[in-house]
């Protein structure tokens, strides 16, 4: 929030982008913000404690989850589990992309999908 103030940005001008632990942090923070952000992109992470989210959710920004199907750090099963947890908490705009042949990382196809999502949510 301090950075948003410093940069003179409104929440609707922000898409949160996270990788691995950053995704986990983003999926914890974004739904609990009073002022909804434009969206969130999460690579190779998981939704921690989805049962708590149902009672703690305040805002439901659009969320794009991206995961490599060869990830040996955070299993690919974390993607559908996160999507399911978000939907149970009332999220309607949850999107997913699987990066074929990708381990715990960001591949060009995933980055392209993420950029298109961010452009769409920011109206660019």
Regions found by a protein language model. Name each.
Residues 17-22, 26:
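Gly/Ala-rich beta-loop-alpha elbow adjacent to hydrolase catalytic centers
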Residues 80-124:
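C-terminal catalytic histidine-bearing segment of alpha/beta-hydrolase fold enzymes
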């Amino acid at each position: 929030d301090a950075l948003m103030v410093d940069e003179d940005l409104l929440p609707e001008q922000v898409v949160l982008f996270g990788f691995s632990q950053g995704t986990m942090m983003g999926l914890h923070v974004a739904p609990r913000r009073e002022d909804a952000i434009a969206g969130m992109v999460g690579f190779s992470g998981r939704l921690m404690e989805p049962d708590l989210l149902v009672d703690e959710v305040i805002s439901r920004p659009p969320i794009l989850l991206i995961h490599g199907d060869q990830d040996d750090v955070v299993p690919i099963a974390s993607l559908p589990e996160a999507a399911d947890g978000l939907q149970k908490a009332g999220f309607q705009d949850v999107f997913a992309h699987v990066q074929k042949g990708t381990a715990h990382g960001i591949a060009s196809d995933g980055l392209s999908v993420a950029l298109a999502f961010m452009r769409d949510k920011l109206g660019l």
